[in-house]
Each structure stands twice: as structure tokens, then as C-alpha cells.
Amino acid sequence: MRTLLPSHTPATVTTAARRRHVIHCAGKRSDSFSINSSSSDWQSSCAILSSKVNSQEQSESLSSNSNGSSSYHVSAVNGHNNGAGVSDLNLVPFNNNQSIQSKKPLSISDLSPAPMHGSNLRVAYQGVPGAYSEAAAGKAYPNCQAIPCDQFEVAFQAVELWIADRAVLPVENSLGGSIHRNYDLLLRHRLHIVGEVQLPVHHCLIALPGVRKEFLTRVISHPQGLAQCEHTLTKLGLNVAREAVDDTAGAAEFIAANNIRDTAAIASARAAEIYGLEILEDGIQDDASNVTRFVMLAREPIIPRTDRPFKTSIVFAHEKGTCVLFKVLSAFAFRNISLTKIESRPNHNVPIRLVDEANVGTAKHFEYMFYIDFEASMAESRAQNALSEVQEFTSFLRVLGSYPMDMTSWSPSSSSSSSSTFSL
């Protein structure tokens, strides 16, 4: 995927009190949270990071007296030091007018947990202001402090490092299907699903003021945004190239920042308002009932209950491949547990296997991880018994979370519903 968003200088961590932050990840992590890691892994990592920041803060306070510097370098992430794989976080503060403010060092209070509820809850999401993920964060946690992140994995890291208390990330769309990247990240990281929210999506074709759609040569947006508007773009008779970028609002920001007049973006009406663009076509999604499902992630799971509808998400694998899937499904069917989703993803640890169990021959099958959502709480005995039976057939089983279902009613998306603002 080609990223058109401007890059930022890595290797610094800065903040501004009581402001939102943009988190940028430079480089790749050399160590990720594996399947078999425990919750103590990230707890100890956060403690190590806090200790390093505290010691560096003392040393930098001495040097700042001589050179006036107000930022410093965090040389380790997740407690892992040195090496080319070190990943740095670059926090760029900004206010509602999108202007960069004076930088201040990141304090230990920024790595401490925020209250569970209320206006101080810090919620990470992927994208920039105006993204649908920001709207989902506002719907899930009204009056929260939104923390934009440039990549999905950075949102996971923000919660693991206590920079954010929650992350709100999309997992599937009613038109575009599953966001496979986030399913892989759910397995790689040790965060827990603590809730879900369904957001109606209302796409607009937006461009700089005065631009006519007849003169467009390119349309940019998130891959899901392009897929959800493919037929409508064709019906409009636009002979344009489709180009994927990291997020919908980021596409609008890129056009505005670079004054590009031959390119339009697929984004929300709020993104057009934020970045000073005009709406050329309104409601261009192929289906008016376009909904994206987001999950809320936290460091600790919530306590399952039975006083309201709950949903549980699991992931499992078996060394014999798909032949056990029928047995797994039967464990839920016999207990009248409804499944709402089944998703298969290649097993990265064992990508392929020989058909012959004696490891001879050339024919090969893919190994898969299976993600399942079912309508039951882990506080119910039928759910516990079902998973006990599933565990007999699988070589790996993990509960990603048991959480309240989003039962709010919604109607086909409209401009008013999508462009509403949130106190973030």
C-alpha cells in the first residue's frame, strides 16, 4: 500500500499537557507479543520503560540547563534495548486548529493509567482527525481524549505502554468484509476485547474548492473506502485511477496540505469540513446500509455478566487443519449457541504442511487460525462447557474477550449522522 502522508522525524517523544497526540512509529519491532506470552510480559516491559524514562528525565534535566532542549530520546520500546529493530514513538501535539504547539518532555504521568470512565479516558485509534475510527471512539467513549495513531499496530502499542487506556479499531465492514490486518494483530498482542461498537459509514467524494469531478484523474482513500464505493465511482463515469492510502481522513489531509487539484478523496463530511474541502458527491457508498464494526481493546479483560447480551471472541488452531472444524461447530450447535462470525487466517508459525503425515510427497495444505464470535457470555455454563469441548479438539485456544454486544439500533447512513462532531 502506498502511503501518501508526510513522514515525521523519529526518535523523540514529546507531549503537551491536556492535548491530544499523534503517535508515529518509526522502524519495526524486533519483538512482538507472541501467542504464548503472558500479561506479565507487557507489565514488566512497561515498568522497564518507565524506569528508563525516569532516569533519562533526570539526565536530560541537567543537559537542558545548558542547551535549552525540551525533548529527549527514548531508546527502548516494550523494555527491549538497542538494535536496528528498536521502534521509537514520536508524539506530535496539536490543538483543534491543527497547529503544532510547543513541545514538552513526556512525563511518567503520561505512562500511568487513566480512570476507567469519564472525560480523562485516553482512547487510541488509527488515522487522523476526521477518520471514521475517531467517530467510533467518540461513540464508544463519549468525551474521551482521542489519540490518533498512524498505524493499527501503534494503537496496540499505545495501550500496552500505558500511553492510552483503550484502543478502538475496525475489524469488519458490511461491504468490504474483514480487516485482516487487525485480526493478525489481535493474535500477536495480548490486549483483550472489552466491547464493540457498530458505526454507519457515509462516504463522500471531496476535493479542493472549485474542482470539478470531470477533471479528476485520481481518487485516493483507504482500501476499504475504495472497495465500498467501487460501483458508484463507475456509475459516475469517472475515468480515474484508484490509489490506496492509510486512512480516509488522511487522504483528505494530503490533498489539502499539498493543494492537489486533480485528485479527490473518499472520506466523511466531517473530514471535508476539517480540511477545508468541498463535497462533490454525497453518499457514494455502494450500499446505504454500510456499517463498520469496531472493537474496544484494553490491557485487562472485563468480568463477564449474564444480565445483558454478551458476545465472546476466540481463536484456535489444530495441527490437522480444517478437519476438526465440524467438531468445533458441533460443540456450539448442541448447546444452542449462535455463531456470528467465522474467520480463517493463515498460521504464520506453520504456514504450510505436507499432506502426507509421514512428511513425504509434494502436495501441501495451508495451516489456518480460526477466529469465531458467538453470542454467549463466559459467565454462562453452556459457554464454558462448549470451550472445554473445543479445547479437546484443538492444539491452541485463546479467548480474545467476552464483552457486551452493541445492541443500539441504526438506520441507513445519512450525512447528518456521519458528520456529527464528538467532544474528543
Curated annotation (Swiss-Prot):
Location relative to the cell: Plastid, Chloroplast stroma
Region (Disordered): 57-77
Keyword entries, A-Z: Amino-acid biosynthesis, Aromatic amino acid biosynthesis, Chloroplast, Lyase, Phenylalanine biosynthesis, Plastid, Transit peptide
Family matches, as PROSITE patterns: ACT, PREPHENATE_DEHYDR_1, PREPHENATE_DEHYDR_2, PREPHENATE_DEHYDR_3
CC per GO annotation: chloroplast; chloroplast stroma; cytosol
Entry EC number(s): 4.2.1.91
Major localisation: plastid
Disruption phenotype: Lack of Phe and Tyr accumulation after blue light irradiation of etiolated seedlings.
Chain intervals with Low complexity compositional bias: 57-71
Name the UniProt record assigns to this protein: Arogenate dehydratase 3, chloroplastic
The species this protein was found in: Arabidopsis thaliana (Mouse-ear cress)
GN (gene name): ADT3
